[in-house]
């Protein structure tokens, strides 16, 4: 379990092959496959490599189709609770637009229902001091990327300029087409940019 994103528990694997198929056929990666024979049969990367030694981008599709919990997405829930219970910490949360719309379905609400108000109330009850909307940072990122694009126009490139807030997409490019690395925008994602702004804000506030 060396991957930053994926956790595997082979004791729960029933060898159905759903993860193998989605990785190969849907994602085009082919990281997972069957290895060994008979009672030793396992689903694993080729040559017994660890996930961080492969071209796995941590997209999470294998975890999404796993019905037994043999593959799950790693989380930091334990660390979050520790932070909330430490009186020395100021816990601040930012909520991305996709989260406030998608999360409702998990609790049986109609698809697309906006649960921002419920999220804010729940987070406050948990002990979160302040809750912010990442939409604000999306505007900051747009302005920064537009400025970077203008700078590239003036200086003759490099073109095209790629931009994505998805770390799995960036990882895919790094591993599969590294020749395009200089085409990726140097701007941070809205989440990273907002986190930096908040740290500066509270650093000045606490000074």
What do these predicted ranges mean?
Residues 2, 12, 55, 112-113:
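Charged, low-complexity surface patches
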Residues 50-72, 174-178, 183, 187:
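Helix-enriched interaction subdomains in cytosolic or periplasmic regions
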Residues 1-50:
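Ferredoxin-type iron-sulfur electron-transfer modules and their immediate structural context
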Residues 5, 15, 58, 115-118:
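Residue-level preference for nonpolar/small residues embedded in alpha-helices
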Residues 73-207:
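Iron-sulfur-associated redox domains of electron-transfer enzymes in respiratory
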Residues 36-44, 51-60, 70-88:
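Terminal amphipathic helices with adjacent charged low-complexity linkers/tails
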